[in-house]
């Protein structure tokens, strides 16, 4: 009260009122604010009052020789007065116009090369097709996506070294270009940018766009490859989407897609071999994708997919700490658990040994078509909030979560025996047994789960055992949400270990990945995948196995010949003959092998009966474990082209034909 009274007294004096209302603002603090530091405090205002002046621009004195004092309209382009405080000339904005129209021109040949990513983007947009706009609720989830199409996959450090080498080759500083891609790019770019007049800094900035993958964590509904992300602002809003087909593909998307296909094929093939881990490594090291070694791509490419991550783990690379189950990526966001083995009885009274997770935990589950939040305690699902594209996708997520929860009612819902096996004919572990069982048919699981009345919560509805939505009732603990669950945003990578059966574990021993998690989806790779390993010959069917086996023998004939005479057993055990065995009828394998080995022994014993063509022809049959019998064969059967084809022991056949005069060998009509 005292203060107010004091202020009133002050205001009653006319002088005070005048000072407070009429005087100019020349307060020291304000002057300081607008004059200290180099940072412009009010850029918009500064721009306005600068442009209101006649000569807002300053330029080097040389400009007076390069630009006339007046333009064609007689307007002054620069003033003879010096800029205060510097020896520069005051210039009118009209001078810029004059320069743009009449100034010297420079070669534009380097522009498309330097601004390559922009030129290519324009082409993609020109040839892209935009479809109709649909208004509907968009379920977007944040995913880590690739922002700039058309990039290589160098690390920031590698790119920095390449840029310094290309743009500032004479700059001092230790730079070691190690990877093959670094050397190739450096050579290419040096050639391209010879005599380039564009500012080096700009060139460096544009090179960075081309060399490094830029990822952002963005809300997306729909395509996640970089050619879709570059038009994200045009294709999806909060309540609308516009159909779009890109007008071109870019190599980085193709590499990602082809890498996933190659990794899946390799993991599937490795699973059925005698030593899966060794086979996987052998295949990764001998495979090329679009002409680049797969191991180099794995080291640089951040794609997270189950098969790709198994290959990375095998190579000793770090991978994401989230784990995979039922095709969903699980990330624990709260709580912890300890594992304990427990024996449980299924509805069919079959005993299963499962590793029970004891403790309260919360997870996010992210799949291709559905996402969820799961809260669980020991063998109990507390809550599952799920969102997905359609009924089917939501059902998939619910099944995975129910199995993962390890609830008793789920185990009791099993009807019939669980005997699922993997590609190598080994029984799956109990959790995957349960998963496969309910993925085939979840009717009993949903019926036995139980339902509960639900409260009306904004954005959430219930779902009934037959997967229809409801506002009154829902499966116990399960709700369907309009909002998606964001993918785990962290790019943190952890050290993992892998066993010989390709199970990947973190340092605490939790299984993050196993071959059971690798998708069976087949796709056509965008880039050529060259598998040099004999284990992958069968990927293109029986014919390819037949041709490749004989080609291998011919390519390595010099060493094969010596081994054939000196250490045949070692030769017979070569892994290159393994795929061929699948072509020989099971019942005949060991008989053929015994017969051919005996024949070869006779050739070795009787000098001068060495018959190159016959050895090449029969050698693959000798690889199976032999059966000692006196059986003789005039022809051997191989299963190609959907039926048995004969290879004649003495003589030619369509499957194996050698022309003595032209010295041409054809396998199934193809040159070997």
UniProtKB/Swiss-Prot annotation:
InterPro entries: Flu_PB2_2nd, Flu_PB2_6th, Flu_PB2_CAP-bd, Flu_PB2_middle, Flu_PB2_N, PB2_helical. Plays an essential role in transcription initiation and cap-stealing mechanism, in which cellular capped pre-mRNAs are used to generate primers for viral transcription. Binds the cap of the target pre-RNA which is subsequently cleaved after 10-13 nucleotides by PA. Plays a role in the initiation of the viral genome replication and modulates the activity of the ribonucleoprotein (RNP) complex. In addition, participates in the inhibition of type I interferon induction through interaction with the host mitochondrial antiviral signaling protein MAVS. Influenza RNA polymerase is composed of three subunits: PB1, PB2 and PA. Interacts (via N-terminus) with PB1 (via C-terminus). Interacts with nucleoprotein NP (via N-terminus). Interacts (via N-terminus) with host MAVS (via N-terminus); this interaction inhibits host innate immune response. Belongs to the influenza viruses PB2 family. GO terms for cellular component: host cell mitochondrion; host cell nucleus; virion component. Its main location: virion. Keywords: Cap snatching, Eukaryotic host gene expression shutoff by virus, Eukaryotic host transcription shutoff by virus, Host gene expression shutoff by virus, Host mitochondrion, Host nucleus, Host-virus interaction, Inhibition of host innate immune response by virus, Inhibition of host MAVS by virus, Inhibition of host RLR pathway by virus, Inhibition of host RNA polymerase II by virus, mRNA capping, mRNA processing, Viral immunoevasion, Viral transcription, Virion. This is Polymerase basic protein 2. Pfam families: Flu_PB2_1st (PF20947), Flu_PB2_2nd (PF20948), Flu_PB2_3rd (PF20949), Flu_PB2_4th (PF20950), Flu_PB2_5th (PF00604), Flu_PB2_6th (PF20951). It comes from the Viruses. GO terms for biological process: 7-methylguanosine mRNA capping; cap snatching; symbiont-mediated suppression of host cytoplasmic pattern recognition receptor signaling pathway via inhibition of MAVS activity; symbiont-mediated suppression of host gene expression; symbiont-mediated suppression of host mRNA transcription via inhibition of RNA polymerase II activity. It is found in: Virion; Host nucleus; Host mitochondrion. It comes from Influenza A virus (strain A/Chicken/Hong Kong/220/1997 H5N1 genotype Gs/Gd).
């Amino acid at each position: 009260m005292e203060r107010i009274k004091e202020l009133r007294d002050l205001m009653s004096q006319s002088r005070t009122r005048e000072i407070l209302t009429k005087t100019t603002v020349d307060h020291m603090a304000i002057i300081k604010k607008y004059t200290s530091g180099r940072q412009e405090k009010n850029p918009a205002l500064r721009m306005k009052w600068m442009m209101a002046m006649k000569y807002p621009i300053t330029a080097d004195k040389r400009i007076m020789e390069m630009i006339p004092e007046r333009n064609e309209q007689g307007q002054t382009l620069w003033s003879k007065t010096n800029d205060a405080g510097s020896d520069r000339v005051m210039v009118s904005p009209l001078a810029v116009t004059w320069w743009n129209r009449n100034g010297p021109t420079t070669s534009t040949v380097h522009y498309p090369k330097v601004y390559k990513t922009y030129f290519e983007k324009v082409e993609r947009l020109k040839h892209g097709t935009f479809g109709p706009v649909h208004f509907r609720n968009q379920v977007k989830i944040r995913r880590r996506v690739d922002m700039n199409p058309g990039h290589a996959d160098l690390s920031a450090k590698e790119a920095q070294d390449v840029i310094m080498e290309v743009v500032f080759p004479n700059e001092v500083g230790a730079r070691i270009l190690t990877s093959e891609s670094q050397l190739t790019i450096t050579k290419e770019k040096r050639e391209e940018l010879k005599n380039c007049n564009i500012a080096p800094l700009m060139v460096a900035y544009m090179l960075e766009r081309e060399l490094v993958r830029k990822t952002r964590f963005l809300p997306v509904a729909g395509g996640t490859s970089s050619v879709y992300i570059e038009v994200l602002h045009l294709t999806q809003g909060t309540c609308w989407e516009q159909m779009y087909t890109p007008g071109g593909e870019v190599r980085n998307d193709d590499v990602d897609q082809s890498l996933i296909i190659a990794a899946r094929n390799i993991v599937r093939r490795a699973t059925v071999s005698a030593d899966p881990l060794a086979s996987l490594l052998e295949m990764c090291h001998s495979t090329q994708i679009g002409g680049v070694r797969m191991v180099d791509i794995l080291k640089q490419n951040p794609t997270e997919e189950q098969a790709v991550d198994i290959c990375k783990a095998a190579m000793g690379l770090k991978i994401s700490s989230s784990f995979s189950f039922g095709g969903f990526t699980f990330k624990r966001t709260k709580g912890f658990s300890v594992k304990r083995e427990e024996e449980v009885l299924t509805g069919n009274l079959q005993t299963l040994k499962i590793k029970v997770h004891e403790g309260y935990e919360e997870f996010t589950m992210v799949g291709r078509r559905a996402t969820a939040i799961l809260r669980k305690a020991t063998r109990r699902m507390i809550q599952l909030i799920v969102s997905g594209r359609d009924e089917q996708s939501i059902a998939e997520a619910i099944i995975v979560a129910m199995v993962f929860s390890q609830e008793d009612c789920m185990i009791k819902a099993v009807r019939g025996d669980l005997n699922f096996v993997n590609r190598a004919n080994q029984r799956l572990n109990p959790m995957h047994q349960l998963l496969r069982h309910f993925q085939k048919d979840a009717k009993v699981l949903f019926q036995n789960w139980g339902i509960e009345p639900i409260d009306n919560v904004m954005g959430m509805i219930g779902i009934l055992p037959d997967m229809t939505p409801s506002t009154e009732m829902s499966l116990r603990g399960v709700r369907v949400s309009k909002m998606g669950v964001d993918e785990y945003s962290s790019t943190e990578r952890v050290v993992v270990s892998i066993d010989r059966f390709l199970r990947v574990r973190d340092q605490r021993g939790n299984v993050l990945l196993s071959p059971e998690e690798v998708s069976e989806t087949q796709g056509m790779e965008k880039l050529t995948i060259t598998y040099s390993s004999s284990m992958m010959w069968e990927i293109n069917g029986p014919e390819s196995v037949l041709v490749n086996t004989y080609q291998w023998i011919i390519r390595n004939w010099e060493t094969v010949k010596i081994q054939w005479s000196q250490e045949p057993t070692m030769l017979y055990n070569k892994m290159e003959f393994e795929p061929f065995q699948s072509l020989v009828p099971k019942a005949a394998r060991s008989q053929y092998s015994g017969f051919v080995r005996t024949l070869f022994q006779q050739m070795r014993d009787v000098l001068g009966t060495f018959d190159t063509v016959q050895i090449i022809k029969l050698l693959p049959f000798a690889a199976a474990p032999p059966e000692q019998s006196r059986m003789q064969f005039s022809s051997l059967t191989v299963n190609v082209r959907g039926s048995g084809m004969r290879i004649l022991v003495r003589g030619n056949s369509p499957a194996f034909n050698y022309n003595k005069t032209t010295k041409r060998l054809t396998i199934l009509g193809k040159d070997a």
